[in-house]
């Protein structure tokens, strides 16, 4: 569950995740932005989330990184909370048991992103979420570059984004011209998403998440996303 995506105010992701998990009985992941909250607020939200039965959290830097607590610092003190301690090494009400996630953005400078990715792993990230990609060969090149620079594989799960498309829908990443052409000439966005997933499979990558197609009105096509999940499972 994203943290206030777009410009409008949304339900706090902790409460939205609790509602989704309660209704579906499927473990939910909530997101917290480190530029809107101080350390005490984050710790309080994490304790509250844990009391509601939420165990999965992703930390993002947000749109104002100059105001944000570094993601690595948040990862470190959340790991301490899993040991029953707060940032000052004082005991918290109860030890948490979070599976802690952070993000990878391969659209940025790779030299910096590779170093940051390694730091996030060392700081306690249990998994990564990556932005939607249309060029899967680029994903593979990034993973190879990481291995060449650090001497190790990324040995924690990465959930790669698959952006579903439709005529008139938006995208959080640039859409290649060939995919725009296919879409404008009648190829269903459903089939385009399947093609992208097949490319992931061809490289042995089997972990991803779907972003339903979205429109300027705010509408999101969750039905098509559900159909795609049913097709894959």
Which residues make up each language-model segment?
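Hydrophobic faces of well-ordered beta-strands that scaffold small-molecule active sites
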Residues: 1, 28-32, 57-59, 98-104, ...
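Catalytic beta/alpha-barrel core
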Residues: 1-9, 32-34, 57-61, 126-136, ...
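Active-site-adjacent beta->alpha loops and helix N-cap segments on the catalytic face
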Residues: 7-20, 37-45, 63-90, 110-112, ...
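Short, acidic/polar
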Residues: 13, 39-47, 109-119, 189-199
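Acidic (Asp/Glu)-rich catalytic clusters
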Residues: 14-25, 46-54, 87-95, 118-122, ...
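Active-site mouth loops of central-metabolism enzymes
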Residues: 27-40, 98-112, 177-192
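Catalytic-face loop-and-helix region of soluble metabolic enzyme cores
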Residues: 153-209
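C-terminal extensions of enzymes
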Residues: 194-232
């Amino acid at each position: 569950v994203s943290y206030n995506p777009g410009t409008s105010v949304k339900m706090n992701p902790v409460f939205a995740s609790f509602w989704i998990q309660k209704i579906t009985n499927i473990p939910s992941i909530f997101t917290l932005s480190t530029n809107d909250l101080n350390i005490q607020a984050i710790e309080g939200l994490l304790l509250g989330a844990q009391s509601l039965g939420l165990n999965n959290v992703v930390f993002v830097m947000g749109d104002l990184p100059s105001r944000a607590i570094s993601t690595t610092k948040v990862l470190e003190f959340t790991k301490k909370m899993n040991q029953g301690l707060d940032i000052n090494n004082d005991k918290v009400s109860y030890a948490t048991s979070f599976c802690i996630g952070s993000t990878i953005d391969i659209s940025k400078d790779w030299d910096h992103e590779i170093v940051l990715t390694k730091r996030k792993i060392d700081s306690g990230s249990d998994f990564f979420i990556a932005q939607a990609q249309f060029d899967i060969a680029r994903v593979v090149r990034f993973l190879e570059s990481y291995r060449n620079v650090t001497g190790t594989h990324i040995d924690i799960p990465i959930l790669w984004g698959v952006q579903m498309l439709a005529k008139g829908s938006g995208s959080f990443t640039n859409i290649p011209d060939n995919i725009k052409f296919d879409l404008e000439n009648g190829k269903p966005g459903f089939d385009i998403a399947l093609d992208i997933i097949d490319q992931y499979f061809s490289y042995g990558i089997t972990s991803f998440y779907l972003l339903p197609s979205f429109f300027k009105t705010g509408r999101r096509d969750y039905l098509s996303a559900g159909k795609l999940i049913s097709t894959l499972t």
